[in-house]
């Protein structure tokens, strides 16, 4: 649980704007299909893997359109080189985790973590992006897709506990800056 008091999120809100700039999030001009809904109220972060490598966020967008969705289902996509791409706008209801699409931020990492590992640069970006979302939305909980749905995603080499610890450390580091 990442409750309000624990990291002094109020103080952190002031530095968040600069912190988000550092993340250098890339925006793509997606062509959205019908049915994009606003009104996402994030309380959770849900982590995913793309299950394959060398996929751009545009390719994922096209794949998700072909599934009959309005476009890329995730709010963020992190490539192996650590670059963060915006998917859906944060206020858009996601299409990434059944039962959690209306109250979460979906973050997907490029790769298949059943048989490969998160790159150092991906981990770095993931930790910072997660910390930023926690500060922004006072996120209560972060979990892997498999924690909320019957799936292998985000894979056995995605260590949710390690990531939660790194994010907690990052929030503490930010407070002490």
Give names to the regions the model predicted.
Residues 48, 108-109:
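Conserved beta-strand segments of the P-loop GTPase G domain that flank and frequently precede/overlap
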Residues 94, 98-101:
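Flexible, solvent-exposed short loops/turns enriched in glycine
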Residues 1-43, 83-84, 89, 103, ...:
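Basic/polar, cationic surfaces and motifs that engage anionic cell-wall
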Residues 33-90:
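Secreted/periplasmic proteins that engage bacterial cell-wall peptidoglycan
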């Amino acid at each position: 649980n990442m409750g309000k008091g624990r990291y002094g999120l109020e103080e952190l809100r002031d530095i968040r704007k600069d912190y988000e700039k550092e993340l250098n999030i890339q925006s793509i001009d997606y062509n959205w299909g019908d049915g994009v809904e606003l009104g996402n109220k994030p309380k959770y972060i849900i982590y995913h893997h793309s299950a394959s490598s060398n996929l751009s966020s545009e390719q994922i967008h096209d794949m998700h359109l072909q599934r009959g969705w309005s476009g890329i289902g995730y709010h963020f996509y992190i490539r192996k080189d650590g670059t963060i791409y915006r998917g859906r706008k944060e206020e858009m209801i996601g299409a990434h985790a059944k039962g959690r699409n209306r109250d979460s931020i979906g973050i997907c990492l490029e790769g298949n973590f059943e048989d490969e590992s998160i790159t150092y640069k991906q981990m770095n970006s993931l930790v910072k992006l997660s910390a930023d979302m926690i500060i922004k939305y006072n996120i209560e909980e972060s979990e892997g897709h498999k924690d909320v749905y019957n799936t292998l995603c985000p894979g056995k080499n995605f260590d949710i506990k390690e990531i939660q610890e790194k994010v907690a450390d990052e929030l503490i580091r930010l407070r002490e800056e």
